[in-house]
């Protein structure tokens, strides 16, 4: 498996986390301000290069009923911009309850970074189950 970068998209901030090369661990990485801006997208492209990520997973904020709303549409559009800016494949992954989980877990990393790590953990876990 290769490194995977996960992003917890928000209008003001975007948390980022990266996997280890074996796809076992998700580590909170950083928070990017204004991720939809040209500077924010360039910062994400830089993270992709620096980490050697070959795939980016963007959290898809579905409702508790599993439906898409305005935030999900924004995440889909953001994923397209990330793919173009970073030149890598981008997947969307259900992020329901990741922010509340990040709030409960605490730690030295910021809440957005922890939410991105939770998205990545969930994505990695799903891949292990499918094997």
Positions of PLM-derived features:
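Phosphate- and other anionic-substrate recognition elements at nucleic-acid/protein interfaces
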Residues: 2-7, 11-131
